Curated annotation (Swiss-Prot):
Its main location: nucleus. InterPro entries: bHLH_dom (IPR011598), HES_HEY (IPR050370), HLH_DNA-bd_sf (IPR036638), Orange_dom (IPR003650). It is found in: Nucleus. Transcription repression requires formation of a complex with a corepressor protein of the Groucho/TLE family. Interacts with the bHLH protein hes6; this interaction may inhibit the transcriptional repressor activity. Binds DNA in the form of a heterodimer with the bHLH protein hey1/hrt1. Interacts (via Orange domain) with id3 (via HLH domain). The gene is hes4. Residues 9-22 have a biased composition (Low complexity). One of its GO terms (cellular component) is nucleus. Has a particular type of basic domain (presence of a helix-interrupting proline) that binds to the N-box (CACNAG), rather than the canonical E-box (CANNTG). This is Transcription factor HES-4. Residues 1-44, 262-281 are annotated as: Disordered. Residues 34-91 form the bHLH domain.
Length: 281
């Protein structure tokens, strides 16, 4: 029969399989696969940030060093970084110099050390017979003039246990020839001017050098070299001296010892004065 022979169409399981698989979501990627796929993008962004920062750093460092950017348009990355490191080191030295200059004890310590070194040079020149008299006079005059510049500046007063002595160069000696104090050009980086023209120069190794200006010689009888003596030392047969002491140093083929040229008022000369010289260290 036609009605019996007709059958209802049934869905084939094979035909329905693609439809069910198309509706299922994709499997999520693992963390390692995600990092691997995003690594080129992150690397590109990182390089872009580095190049942008180096470009800005190049502009800043050239402006800070006051260099023409057109002449340094092809600076390598290593050159930019080296210039930046050097500039930052110089800035750090300048800041340290400013901090030391603000400290009033710095000049006092330097003055005491300079005074002691000057005394040692004077003793050597007084006992050495092979030094020319003119050279000896010029050197001592130069040192005394440099010390006079330091004395004219503001500094901490020495303790009460120390009293100033003076050794005056006689006016009969020839006028000393100016011998400017020199500092290594490599160390002359951003000098800091102190009071009275005194300069504190930072060195490349992190230390500091004191630059003394060339003094202007006046028509005074002679430059005065202040020394220090311990007031606790008393001369035999006389009371303790509390006033400054003056002496004269003469120059000849054989100069007398500097200790013998300094004599306290109303006291003895010679070894007692040599023992009374104050040493800061």
């Amino acid at each position: 029969m036609p009605a019996d022979s007709m059958e209802k169409p049934t869905a084939s399981p094979i035909a329905g399989a693609p439809a069910s698989s198309a509706q299922t979501p994709d499997k999520p990627k693992s963390a390692s696969e995600h990092r691997k796929s995003s690594k080129p993008i992150m690397e590109k962004r990182r390089r872009a940030r580095i190049n942008e920062s180096l470009g800005q750093l190049k502009t800043l460092i050239l402006d800070a060093l006051k260099k023409d950017s057109s002449r340094h348009s092809k600076l390598e990355k290593a050159d930019i970084l080296e210039m930046t490191v050097k500039h930052l080191r110089n800035l750090q030295r300048v800041q340290m110099t400013a901090a030391l200059t603000a400290d009033p004890s710095v000049l006092g310590k330097y003055r005491a050390g300079f005074n002691e070194c000057m005394n040692e040079v004077t003793r050597f020149l007084s006992t050495c017979e092979g030094v020319n008299t003119e050279v000896r006079t010029r050197l001592l005059g130069h040192l005394s003039s440099c010390l006079g510049q330091i004395v004219a500046m503001n500094y901490q007063q020495p303790p009460s246990s120390q009293q100033p002595l003076h050794v005056q160069l006689p006016s009969s000696t020839p006028a000393p020839v100016p011998m400017p104090c020199k500092v290594n050009p490599a160390e002359a980086i951003s000098p800091k001017v102190f009071q009275g023209g005194f300069q504190l120069v930072p060195a490349t190794d992190g230390q500091f050098a004191f630059l003394i200006p060339n003094p202007a010689y006046t028509t005074s009888p002679g430059p005065v070299i202040p020394l220090y003596a311990n007031t606790n030392v008393t001369s035999p047969g006389g009371p303790q001296s509390q006033s400054p002491v003056q002496g004269l140093t003469t120059f000849g083929h054989k100069m007398p010892h500097m200790a013998q040229a300094v004599s306290p008022l109303g006291g003895s000369t010679g070894a007692d004065s040599a023992e009374s010289v104050w040493r800061p260290w």
